[in-house]
Amino acid sequence: MSKEELISMMRKFKDAFNKKDLEKTLSFFAEDADWVNPNGKFKGKEEIKNYFKWVFEINPDQKIIDSGVKIIAEEDKAVYEHILEGSFEGMKYQILALCIYESKGSKFQHLRSTFDRLSMAKQLAKGPIAKTAVNTIINRMEKGLK
């Protein structure tokens, strides 16, 4: 697959994801694909499908938005810098995400994603106990930084 074809496939994947089109979103993955992200490790199309169902259910308005360097591709590998934006239980969030895509043939074979769950927790913490817990963790991690 050429660099241009990989970028095109990633953009089509983003569009399907943003439309919450489960079957179309899943169609970009090889049968034995794997995806590692802060929510877990998902091996095979069935586990990836269950992950998408869960994401679409708890984050019905989550969108992938281009950010920063966007997509940098080389042969069968690409890195994508983007923002995940949505809401959870009525509270809005926006977090930076980085994904590494590796293709095999015309499908995604390996996907590794990272995003800051603590930043998301800070934006979504509800009530004094949750806010205190999240801020305590953040303050401990940033001790001596400022």
Give residue spans per PLM region.
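Hydrophobic pocket/interface hotspot
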Residues: F13, T25-L26, A33, G44, ...
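Short beta-strand segments enriched in hydrophobic/aromatic residues
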Residues: F29, H82-G86, C99, F115
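Hydrophobic/aromatic beta-strand elements that line small-molecule binding cavities or substrate pockets
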Residues: F52, D66-I71, L84, L96-E102
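Short beta-strand edge/turn micro-motifs at domain boundaries
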Residues: L96-P128, T132
